[in-house]
Amino acid sequence: MNWILLLLALVMIACILCNKLTSKIGMPVLLAFLAVGMLCGVDGPLHIRFDNYALTETLCTVALIFIIFYGGFGIKWRAAKPVAGKAVLLSTLGVFLTAAAMGVFCRFALHTGWLEGMLMGAVLGSTDAASVFSILRSKKLDLKYGTASLLEVESGSNDPVAYLITTIVLAMMTTEISAGRMLYMIFAQIVYGVGIGAVLAVCTVFFLRRFRFETSGFDTVFMAAIAILSYVLPVLIGGNGYLSAYIAGIILGNQKIPNKKNQVHFFDGVTGFMQLMVFFLLGLLCTPSKLGSVILPALAIAVVLTFVARPLVVGVLLTPFRAKLPQQLLV
């Protein structure tokens, strides 16, 4: 146990030092966390053999709850409102079209099945919320045309949509699913997710304005519990927990609540640690020696997604809004 704690402390320190280095050379720090995980993995100097995917899924789910909740909490609705329509369009229809485009590519170029290709597109079609929030807030970029708000709203809301598409495709791959059942899944995911997130946030604001915590710091613990509740409650009845957490975060972040500055400092630290944990675990699970057989298809998917599918979808959806070409290219 002591050796595990020692390793944990050293990994955290190494990641923090990497943060200092990457900020100087302009590289996303999350890539450094991924690299540290790979160095600690089975093919790295430490030869740590870790393949507990169930534990990784649980830890990453918890991490995403806080990352997405705080992503919503940090959005200024006044700045985001003018671009909300475009952001929602990108995060819904945009993710679906990207997944469909990648499905076609995987089917004809890589000779996968239609559903397997669609699954690949659904998993990869959304922008990574942790990366977007990390880059925009650490670099404090002064982007024109409300692009920063557009990226934040889209990246926070497209993960729930990608999760929904992935769930539907997996259900189609593993069981016979009727059209009615599919429509109900979509309805439940969206309505329960949005509804429970909004109601929980409103009740939380009402409670915080009337209840006084006797011990300093318990308000932040309470808010962490609300973040977890915002995910768990809709999931229990078939709703989208990530969408609920995001909606709850947006509403709470734009309300006047006591000790809000303390909440920001608390979640800054928590989400920083969660991002470190997610990408370190992904690196730890990676086995570079086994990448040889899949590296070319993976690179082909990455290139087509980055330089063909995503730009085409963004262009189709944003051109009617008369979005400037530089904004479309950045998005």
Predicted feature locations:
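Transmembrane helical cores of multi-pass secondary ion antiporters/exchangers
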Residues: M1-V331
